[in-house]
Amino acid sequence: MKINLKKKRRPPRHFIPNILTLFNMFLGFLAIGLILNNHPIKAGVFIIIAGLFDVFDGKIARILGISSRFGMEFDSMADTVSFCVVPSILVYSLYVDGLPPLLGGFISFIPLMFGTIRLAKFNLDEEPGKPKSYTVGLTTPIATITLFSYLFFNHQIDGDFGDPRTALMLVAGLSFLMISPIHFAKFPLFSFKSGRTNTILLLAFIFSMIILAIWQGFILMPLIAVYIGWNIIHWLINPSLNDAPSEADI
């Protein structure tokens, strides 16, 4: 009688999404160091790239059919670093000078606090392998990139990082949106055969990337403002439509 001592090995592709998640976390870690060393613009570039890794890790996992609870939880840990800790450190480094230390620390803590609440809510609502066509509340990557877009915009126009009062109002607004019941459209599937809605969103994304490459810091903030504004208006006008399955899921 032969005993098979060989352990069943998982195929290498199983680790691909987790590697992308690790890159997301690593870029967030580097962004923290850049902010602390007075390089917030470079940190913002790293965070945008981290956001792309955050998009692709889940999509690749679903394409390969290897979505898992571990992957979802690991992704949340990476997002906590890149899109919760990083914006809090950015606010503390740039926008609370002159405030009492305790007050400045609390205000800086707000993105981390609301961001982690948002991530916890997402994990409760989302089932591995069964994605919805929307998210409830603004995602932490979009919220963080929005804050950095304000920094990019002002740095490109005036050479500074913007008015702290405006930045803190933006932080308050983004924090509310993260835990709000408003539905925001997810990143579209990379397919022109997944329904008309997905095709429109995919074309809009491609067009946005083209003009972003041309105008860079000038256009990122307006693009995000359009995305947030459109989703808020759409949810207010047609709240019941957001609960319907997407064409790609039917």
Protein language model features and the residues they cover:
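C-terminal membrane-associated helical module and adjoining short loops/tails
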Residues: 1-5, 132-250
